[in-house]
């Protein structure tokens, strides 16, 4: 089990439902916001449970081939509306298609052969200019006292 405040090196293997990167250190699963598949990161454990924990991204040691320099939207890391904006747009589409397909196979028990016949590729937005990023309509702004 990891300890709170421990600094670890993690290779990100998947992305969770909230857009957080998922990696393992000695079999222990960590969820790391702003990390994407293929990144090797240095992270600080913020919350440690028995079998998993949450960590804060400290440094990207080796960026994924799909990582962008900076998210297009200056509010991306603050508003919570575009969780995987650190990822290039074509990679976002491929990830989303893979996630839907995996859920249909695993949860819906739809055979892969059937999905090959009926499932179409994810349709993205027009990539001219900034169009892939002008259709979102969700924002989460935390407030406190």
Predicted regions span which residues?
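SAM-dependent transferase fold signal centered on methyltransferase-like domains
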Residues: 1-145
């Amino acid at each position: 089990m990891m300890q709170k405040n421990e600094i670890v090196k993690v290779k990100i293997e998947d992305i969770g439902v909230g857009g957080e990167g998922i990696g393992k250190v000695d079999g222990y699963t960590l969820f790391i916001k702003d990390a994407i598949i293929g990144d090797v990161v240095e992270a600080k454990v913020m919350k440690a449970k028995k079998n998993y924990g949450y960590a804060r991204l400290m440094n990207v040691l080796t960026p994924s081939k799909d990582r962008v320099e900076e998210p297009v939207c200056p509010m991306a890391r603050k508003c919570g509306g575009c969780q995987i904006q650190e990822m290039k747009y074509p990679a976002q589409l491929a990830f989303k298609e893979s996630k839907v397909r995996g859920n249909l196979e695993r949860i819906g028990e739809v055979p892969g052969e059937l999905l090959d016949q009926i499932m179409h590729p994810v349709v993205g937005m027009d990539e001219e200019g900034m169009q892939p990023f002008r259709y979102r309509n969700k924002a989460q702004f935390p407030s406190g006292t």
